From Swiss-Prot:
InterPro entries: Intra-flagellar_transport_57. Residues 165-193 have a biased composition (Acidic residues). Signal peptide: none annotated. It comes from Caenorhabditis elegans. This is Intraflagellar transport protein che-13. Disulfide bonds: none annotated. GO terms for biological process: chemosensory behavior; cilium assembly; intraciliary anterograde transport; intraciliary retrograde transport; intraciliary transport; non-motile cilium assembly; protein localization. It is found in: Cytoplasm, Cytoskeleton, Cilium axoneme. Induction: Regulated by the RFX-type transcription factor daf-19. Belongs to the IFT57 family. Disruption phenotype: Worms display defects in ciliary structure resulting in defects in ability and osmotic avoidance behavior. It also affects the localization of IFT complex B proteins, osm-5 and osm-6. Shortened axonemes of all classes of sensory cilia in the head. Required for mating. The keyword Isomerase does not apply. Component of the intraflagellar transport (IFT) complex B required for transport of proteins in the motile cilium. May be required for ciliary entrance and transport of specific ciliary cargo proteins such as che-3 which are related to motility. Required for the formation of chemosensory cilia that detect chemosensory cues. Component of the IFT complex B composed of at least che-2, che-13, dyf-1, dyf-3, dyf-6, dyf-11, dyf-13, ift-20, ift-74, ift-81, ifta-2, osm-1, osm-5 and osm-6.
Length: 412
């Protein structure tokens, strides 16, 4: 028990070290591919071909690396949200609605994140990381929802049983037996049927002292009680039946040897028939290439002078183009200066015209005259009013003086 415990601890430590190496090693970037493949396997366990793909023609089968990289954002986002909604419904939330193609992506992602949080899925990223429809976060959400769905439907992973390891001695013995069987006559056309189980070879070695063997089996192993004559008779009886029949295997090269020979003969025959045509064709192609090469040489010799002229013309055109560019720079600067001066002249013209209009216009004088005449009229009106007031005051004064004088006379 202590040795088993030490082995388990050693294995756990090696697994921990191996996981650390994987996380820090160069294979870290390929881990997302493995996670996507695991997602596809989980979807197949959930039978998504009959459940998800039959919801509509817009849902397509998911490839094993579909969500690794973002290629078609709109299609991947719609498929991600739809698959996440289906997994949420599959995990027990039947009231969850499937998203539509024209729904608000922010609200759709918020609903998916809320449903994942309700199922105990811890997320350390925002919903904006899922808008691309692909990547590590998308695969994490889908994997977590797929795990929750598998738990809800009651799926359980079976423990892997490793194959038994054979000892080297056993492998050597089997190899020796195979070598010995090669010397035995093969009958590939005579195959054993299921009914041949009745003809099982039974070796009955009669020996004395069976009771003694049952009581003391180790003693029977150390000392043989078999008679040589009985052994020889049993060998003569069983020897004719010791014939090995090999079942026909489609992968055995011996079965395809005849077919390979016939195909080889057919290929040789076809090569013999097609060979002359190929030789003639190669000769014709060689002649055509020679004619093309000679024609090319003659054209080059004929057009050598024209090509030299063309090169000189090209050089001249390049020089003229450079000169034109240099002149264009000066013209453009002068054009800008001319435009600026023209704007200044236009402003001066406008100022001169405004000043002339002000000096030649008699409207202010007319306004002044009208104002003076109006003032004169108002002055006359005020003079009349002043005279009326003075008259009324004088009348009042005279009346009061007259009354005062009359009162004095009456008193006296």
């Amino acid at each position: 028990m202590e040795e088993e415990h030490e082995e388990e601890s050693h294995l756990s430590q090696s697994d921990t070290v191996g996981s650390a190496i994987v996380e820090d090693g160069p294979g870290k970037e390929y881990e997302i591919y493995i996670k996507n493949e695991e997602l596809v396997d989980k979807l197949k366990l959930l039978n998504y071909e009959d459940g998800f793909l039959k919801l509509g023609v817009v849902y397509k089968p998911i490839l094993k690396h579909y969500f690794v990289k973002s290629k078609n954002v709109g299609e991947q986002f719609f498929l991600f949200t739809s698959l996440a909604a289906w997994l949420i419904k599959k995990s027990g939330d039947e009231s969850y609605n499937m998203p539509q193609e024209f729904d608000d992506p922010n609200s759709t992602l918020a609903n998916i994140m809320a449903a994942a949080k309700n199922k105990g899925i811890a997320t350390d990223f925002t919903a904006a990381k899922l808008k691309s429809g692909a990547g590590e976060n998308v695969i994490f959400i889908l994997n977590s929802l797929a795990d929750a769905s598998l738990v809800h439907v009651g799926f359980q992973w079976q423990k892997m049983i490793p194959p038994k390891e054979e000892d080297e001695d056993t492998a050597v013995d089997e190899q020796d037996e195979d070598d010995d069987n090669d010397d035995i006559v093969e009958e590939p056309m005579n195959f054993l049927d299921d009914d041949d189980d009745d003809n099982v070879i039974e070796i009955d070695l009669k020996a004395q002292g069976l009771a003694t063997e049952s009581k003391n089996p180790l003693q029977s192993v150390l000392q043989s009680n078999t008679d040589a004559i009985t052994w020889k008779q049993e060998v003569e009886r069983v020897a004719p039946q010791l014939k090995i029949t090999l079942k026909q295997d489609a992968k055995d090269w011996r079965l395809h040897l005849e077919q390979m020979n016939s195909m080889h003969k057919n290929v040789e025959q076809k090569v013999g028939n097609v060979g002359p045509y190929l030789d003639n064709m190669s000769k014709d192609i060689a002649k055509a290439l020679e004619r093309i090469a000679s024609r090319e040489k003659s054209l080059n010799s004929q057009l050598a002078s024209m090509m030299s002229k063309f090169r000189r013309a090209t050089d001249t055109r390049a020089e003229l183009r450079e000169k034109y560019k240099a002149a264009s720079v000066g013209v453009s600067s002068r054009t800008e200066t001319l435009d600026r001066i023209s704007d200044d002249i236009e402003q001066l013209k406008q100022q001169i015209e405004e000043q002339g209009a002000k000096s030649s216009d008699g409207a202010p004088l007319v306004k002044i005259k009208q104002a003076v005449s109006k003032l004169e009229e108002e002055l006359q009106t005020m003079n009349v009013q002043i005279g009326v007031f003075e008259q009324s005051i004088l009348n009042t004064y005279l009346r009061d003086h007259f009354n005062f004088s009359a009162n004095l006379l009456n008193i006296m």
